[in-house]
Amino acid sequence: MITSTEKTAIMAENKIDYIHKDFKEAWDLPSASMWVLTNKGDMVCVSKHPDVYELLEAEDTVRSVMGFEFFAVLTCGWAAPIDDLGELGDLPPSKHKKRRRVRLVVGSDYDGVASVIRFQDKPDETVVDAGMARGSLADSIVSLQKRKALAETADVMTEIKQLLEGETNE
């Protein structure tokens, strides 16, 4: 059964794919980008960085995704098949003889994480993963979601404190 996070990630990836259809370098983007889903249903790019991990770890990124129920990171790279044991092996995907160029959207909301992979050699096909991904990118997305939740909670606590202080000053 498809989760709500998967549905949102698929919709987000389709919107981002539509935006990138006419890009000359749609499979070799110079920067990873952070996108948010607005209340109007639009995907809006809020930040970019040449290094996807630095983008995900930046405090500015936390602030840029606060207040939005869904955010997604877009990046490009190489994918390679996993072995029969489900392992990637020691060879980096970029060096694998069966490597494929991909554009990856990893989205997150309060219910989970989902990713959508689009392959350059078959751009009309996608592979959707409902939070089963593992590795440093998946860990970084989960970390960003946690930091976002903590920052939003801190903002709410500050607002409550200000309201309570306002009541005692009256």
Each predicted region: which residue ranges?
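Short HxH-centered metal-ligating active-site micro-motif
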Residues: 56-96
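Short loop/turn segments at secondary-structure transitions that flank enzyme active sites
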Residues: 40-42, 79, 111-112
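Glycine-rich, aromatic-bearing surface loops/beta-hairpins
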Residues: 94-170
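A signal for specific C-terminal beta-sheet/loop modules enriched in small/flexible residues
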Residues: 45-69, 125-143
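Short glycine-rich, low-complexity/disordered patches
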Residues: 28-38, 70-77, 169-170
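N-terminal domain-onset segments
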Residues: 1-64
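Short, surface-exposed beta-edge/turn micro-motifs
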Residues: 30-34, 68-70, 92, 99-104
